[in-house]
Amino acid sequence: MTNTPSSAPSPLTYRDAGVDIDAGNELVERIKPLVKRSFRPEVMGGLGGFGALFDLSNKYREPVLVSGTDGVGTKLKLAHQLNRHDTIGIDLVAMCVNDVLVQGAEPLFFLDYFATGKLDIDTAAAVVGGIANGCTEAGCALIGGETAEMPDMYAPGEYDLAGFTVAAVEKSELKDGASVAAGDVLIGIASSGPHSNGYSLVRRIYDRAGRPAELELEGGVKLVDALMAPTRLYVKPILSLLKSHGAAIHGMAHITGGGLTENIIRVVPEGLGLDIQASSWTLPPVFQWLQKEGAVADSEMWRTFNCGIGFVLIVAPDQVAAVSEAVKAQGLDHWTIGQVVTAEGAERVHIG
C-alpha cells in the first residue's frame, strides 16, 4: 500500500456522513420479537430477506387482492412535539387497513416505511412497536419494512411514516357500493377521536389556544390524550359482521380526509345522495373544543373531521335492527345517522 501524503484528506466512513448501519441492525434485532408476534400461518420465512413471502393458496377460492397505502399526516408533528411515539404506529396501520376493509377485504400483510435524518433507536423501536401492535390487533402480519436514515433530509428528532397493506376478499363477496339504493340506512360507528385527519387545523387551533397540554375536557380526559388517541381499528368486528350479515350491508365507508361530507358519498352510485341527521349523535368533547376554540363553521367541521363517526355501514332498511344488534354485540357504540336518498346535481350530501 502506498503511503498517504500528509496533505491528503482523512478517510471518511458512512457513519461520518451520517448513516449508522450498526444502529439500523440493532433496531432490527430489537423489533424482531414484536414483528414475529404479528405473523400469521401464511407467512413464509422470517425477517431480512429481499422480499417477504405470503402463501395465499389455501384460504380463498376466487381471491381479489385489495391494496392500500397511507400515512398519518401532520399528526406526526404533534407526536414529535409531545414526544409520544408509542401509538402513532397504530394510527399508521389503521389508516391503511380500515380503507381496504371498506371493500370487505381481510388485511393479510403490512409493510412500513420509516424515514429520519438521524436514527434514534428508542424512538424507532417505539414506533415500530406500535405498528406491530396495530397489525396484531387487525390480524395482519407485519411482513417487512424499510428504515431509511437520510442525513439533512429531516429536522433533528423528526421522522416520517408510510404504510402499505394487501388484503383479500372472495370475488363474490366484494363490497363496491353497486347495490346501494335509495332508502338504505346509514349506521355510524364511533371513532376514538380525530383519528389521523384534520391535524393541520388541529395543530393551528392548539397553538392558537396556547398549547394547553394539561387542559381536561368534559369527562376528565386530557386534551392531549384525546388528540393523540390512536385511530380505531375496525377490522375484526367488521369482518365478523360481514360473515353474519354481509348480504344486508350494501356499502361501507371509512371516514378519513374529507370527513363525513366527502367519504360516504364515494361508495354511493350516481343519482343518489345522503341525508345525514347531525342531531342523531352527540359531538364528542374533543371536537366541541376544536370547534369552539377555532370558531370553526359546522360545514367545515363536517368536511374536515370525522366528528365522532369513524366508520359507516350502508344497510338495507329491513335489516337495520338486526345489523344494529350485531354491531352492539361487537362492543361498538353506534347510531342510525341518516339514509340514502335520490339526488341529482353537485350537492348530493345534506347534513342538518
UniProtKB/Swiss-Prot annotation:
Pathway: Purine metabolism; IMP biosynthesis via de novo pathway; 5-amino-1-(5-phospho-D-ribosyl)imidazole from N(2)-formyl-N(1)-(5-phospho-D-ribosyl)glycinamide: step 2/2. Transmembrane segments: none annotated. InterPro entries: PurM-like_C_dom, PurM-like_C_sf, PurM-like_N, PurM-like_N_sf, PurM_cligase. It is an enzyme of class 6 (ligase). GO terms for cellular component: cytosol. Its EC number is 6.3.3.1. Pfam families: AIRS, AIRS_C. It comes from the Bacteria. It catalyses: 2-formamido-N(1)-(5-O-phospho-beta-D-ribosyl)acetamidine + ATP = 5-amino-1-(5-phospho-beta-D-ribosyl)imidazole + ADP + phosphate + H(+). Keywords: ATP-binding, Cytoplasm, Ligase, Nucleotide-binding, Purine biosynthesis. One of its GO terms (molecular function) is phosphoribosylformylglycinamidine cyclo-ligase activity. It is found in: Cytoplasm. GO terms for biological process: 'de novo' IMP biosynthetic process; adenine biosynthetic process. Belongs to the AIR synthase family. This is Phosphoribosylformylglycinamidine cyclo-ligase. It comes from Stenotrophomonas maltophilia (strain R551-3). The lineage of its organism: Bacteria, Pseudomonadati, Pseudomonadota, Gammaproteobacteria, Lysobacterales.
